[in-house]
Amino acid sequence: ICEQVGEQPVKGIFPRKVVRVVTPGTVTEPGLLPGDANNYLASVILDTTTAVNSNPITASVSYVDITTGEFAVTELPLEALRAELTRLHPAEIIHPDSQVLPDGITGHITALPAWKFEPGKCSEVLISHFKASTLAGFGLKDNSLSARAAGAIVQYLKETQPDALNLLTSLRAYSLNEFMTLDASTRRNLELDETLRGERKGSLLGTLDFSVTPMGKRLMHQWVSQPLLHVAKITQRQNGVQYFVENGMVRAELRATLKPLADLERLVNRVLAGQAQPRDLVAMRATLTELPKIKEVISGQKAVVSDQWSVCTQELSLLQNAIDDDPPATLQNTGVIRPGYSSELDGVIDASKHARDWIANLEGVEREKTGIKTLKVGYNKVFGYYIEISRGAADKAPESYIRKQTLVNAERFITPEMKEYETLVLNAEERIKEIETRLFREVCAELVKAANQILATARAIAELDVLSALGEAAALGGYTRPEVHEGSGLEIHEGRHPVVEQLLKSDRYIPNDVIFEKGEVVRVITGPNMSGKSTYLRQTALIVLMAQMGSFVPAASAKIGLVDRIFTRIGAQDEIHAGQSTFMVEMVEAANILHHATPRSLLILDEIGRGTSTYDGLSIAWGIIEYIHNHPQLRAKTLFATHYHELTQLADLLPGIRNYNVAVSEADNKVVFLHKIIAGGADRSYGIHVGQLAGLPAPVIQRATEIMAELEKTSGRAVKIDPNAAQQVALFPETNPLLDELKELDVNSLSPIEALNKLFEWR
């Protein structure tokens, strides 16, 4: 952004200079920012010092939101980089131009000279910025990969938004081990913050987010994106939610009080960055005014939120005394400071008003004093204020009048006293602007001193907003408090899908249980199309996620052992830009799951193998289930929905596999899907019935029914097991009765008629 500087020259154009560089990650204007989400600038660097075969295995990510002051850094395996960036969804990513970011990382990417990520320089920048002697106090080692990522951000801000550096008062080093891991595929498949169509409504966030403040909405997004892995922290959040569930009147009163609050977090940071305008302080004052009421509403409830935050009495008093109730939008206009705050300013304003009144009354006073009826007072830009008398009466002008201009029909005069008042009037507005600007800056300077205190208050308000919002969601949705523990069990009674049940306005949602018994590893779920298998899988994952973010869950009851990762393989999607088919995408995601899942993970696998031929798909699905069950370092709790009914045979072979299916009612040639998960395997998918429901023409349905009957008569369904094959199961019949009979037949002894009869018999 270039602005005019200096005075307008006699010739030529105004001199200009670059006053600011704007990039996607350094925007601060409220109109350009998403109110309910952070605007992150991320820095990414790969660790080439520990590369294997020239391939880095470690990376560091640092991110900052200069509108809130959030500044953090972590080191992570390269394979987790995409998932972390997906969670952050940064507006801009900077990285060294000497490195190539892994595939799949998209967005606004800015490559910077590699020297800006140099270890010594970056550490020095951080130490200098935080006025520290070492980075150990921030949990970092000098010259470490994390220091390079964070230091590069500080250097970038120096070039683009130097005022924003005041906002960076701390740096938080975090570990991925603090939060549940959710890769990009899982976030998409579970529709955490947006649906597959890119809409917020219909997502988990859209269902749970009853928050009413901008700070609360950003924090809610973080909680949904980062479920916790510490039972104590989860319990603390649950305590807060429970309080608001049980105290509906308090919840309603608090939410009504919070609703009109401004974005205190971003207002403070605009003050810190020197970008605050008068109406920003009015909004801050209105918000601070509500703090005593908020604190009174939750008085004594330490289980809800810490009571260490301040009601900012001094800051509120300052804003009430200093800033006018209805100031102009910018400091370019007067009326910012409240009358009575500054005697100096009041004196100038009074003098200006007195001068204007004196000049306004001057014409009548002078006419009466001189008796000249044609006397009048005027103004122009050349001479300023003047007294004009007609030529015929000019000789009656008092001696105190000083002739200034002679016209054809009049003479113009000034007086010393008039010029004094003129100076007061003409200079007063600029003088008022000057004083108001100085006073405004002084008020902002006092707020800067209290910035940390106000920001702590903003964070407390955000947490209150989220807890009360989750309480609202729980009360409206009939959610219950889950028991989250350090064990490995998973027990959900009458679980429901939190989003789908809200969309089923007229129909009652059918709840289902998920109870993994001791030793149970994989649930193979078969059943008709459109019967609810995929919904059942997703609701299980969402209930676990909600429990670990601290929310209540849509279930009659739930006991959930900590889950470190949720993996999903759901749906068919081509990665055309990467040259990958539907089946290749499916296999890549399945491989990722098998390589990175742990015994504490939850695997949601829907229709694995359907992207290829039946035999290939069945073989792969079979092998995957065996691998999950048998691998000693895997054995993750798995829900495996499939149309391959042959997979139900695995329950007879492997002790940790159970069969379940979706109940169907058949009567009078009608099929009704009951949406209830029951024990046992299904032997039909009712695909033709679904086609009929979808409106396929009757001849198509009739012909499909005939073909299905023929196929069922001729297909071999038996699965034979070799008990000595170390679980390498033969999926299909090893011999065919027809082939055996053909081998035993002596074709040389058959007559032509006998041969034709045999063919007719085998038809």
Predicted regions, residues:
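Charged catalytic and DNA/RNA-contacting regions of genome-maintenance
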Residues: I1-Y243, A252, A256-K259, D263-L272, ...
